[in-house]
């Protein structure tokens, strides 16, 4: 089996998503699954087998995260999906739409891991906007994204509920 993972974040950025991706990569490789990954380039990371890096620019106010170009992510994801059996999306940003588009174009099933309950902490990033309004918008976007998928993986019972 060949799986393509698509993410807006990966090492050297250390966070739960990067750690989860690496856990999937190790575990699935041990089971004989070929895993490909499309993720941002942060700087001068060495080339790594199975990892396609897309140019990324620092997020304003957050030097650890990267913004990836829409077209570059879509092109890299579509190319990497060739010969795959499944697309597994890891983040709900540009990678989500690139992974979904590549999967549909290649006729592949597409799943996502829903790592972050954005409706619970979006207020932290936009404190001047009403919390209830932000929560409803985040919930609506999450619902639309998840409903477009063939399956969703959640890392906890709280996320499932």
What residues fall within each predicted segment?
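N-terminal subdomain of nucleotide-sugar transferases
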Residues: 1-55, 82
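Active-site proximal beta-strand in glycosyltransferases
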Residues: 3, 86, 103-123, 135, ...
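Hydrophobic/aromatic ligand-binding patch that stacks against planar heteroaromatic rings
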Residues: 27, 98, 102, 145
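Alpha-helix capping/helix-boundary segments
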Residues: 43, 94-95, 158-160
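Short, hinge-like loop/turn segments at secondary-structure boundaries
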Residues: 51-56, 105-107, 128-132
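An amphipathic, basic-hydrophobic alpha-helix
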Residues: 59-101, 105, 140
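Membrane-proximal helix-turn-helix segments that form the acceptor-binding/catalytic region
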Residues: 105, 133-151
């Amino acid at each position: 089996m060949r799986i393509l993972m698509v993410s807006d974040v990966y090492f050297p950025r250390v966070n739960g998503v990067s750690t989860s991706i690496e856990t999937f990569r190790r575990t699935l490789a041990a089971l004989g699954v070929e895993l490909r990954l499309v993720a941002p380039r942060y700087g001068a990371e060495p080339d790594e087998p199975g990892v396609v890096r897309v140019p990324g620019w620092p997020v304003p106010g957050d030097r650890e995260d990267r913004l990836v170009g829409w077209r570059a992510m879509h092109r890299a994801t579509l190319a990497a999906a060739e010969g795959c059996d499944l697309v597994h999306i890891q983040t709900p940003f540009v990678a989500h739409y690139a992974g979904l588009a590549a999967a549909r174009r290649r006729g592949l099933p597409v799943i996502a891991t829903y790592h972050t309950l954005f409706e619970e902490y979006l207020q932290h990033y936009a404190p001047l906007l009403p919390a209830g309004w932000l929560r409803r918008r985040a919930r609506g976007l999450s619902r639309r994204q998840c409903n477009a998928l063939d399956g969703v993986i959640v890392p906890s019972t709280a996320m499932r509920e």
